[in-house]
């Protein structure tokens, strides 16, 4: 469907530009995958390699066409179910799982807010995970063709370094939680 919808393609490109501008991946580190693996093994180091894939959804699809709150939302997500190391084996992670607040916490906050003289607020962090730096084993990514710079046309299998905790990375939630705790 995305291939047949120019608006969906544009939504994905817009999201990719936002993520690149934020420094999520570094296009200046581009190199051939085979060279990355060869150099990494020669140095006795570890790397992880994954694919980023685009998705697109329609927000406000229940609204009439043309409504200002009905729009396409592009997302770029790391395929966390298939991250490989320099030997093409499944990658092993630090298991930095995040601990989202449970239902009990939510109810306690609601209760506090219902007490006379008290109030509560909530908000959603804009592009939350990619506010956090990605740690651990360096992760290199294959960008989808629509997000690759023209200068990459000479590469057979280009990869670049992932710098921020992109959605889909198995440890992204843990890095986001650590980032959030540091700033609270």
Which stretches of residues belong to each language-model region?
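Nucleic-acid-interacting cores, centered on viral/eukaryotic replication and modification enzymes
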Residues: 1-184
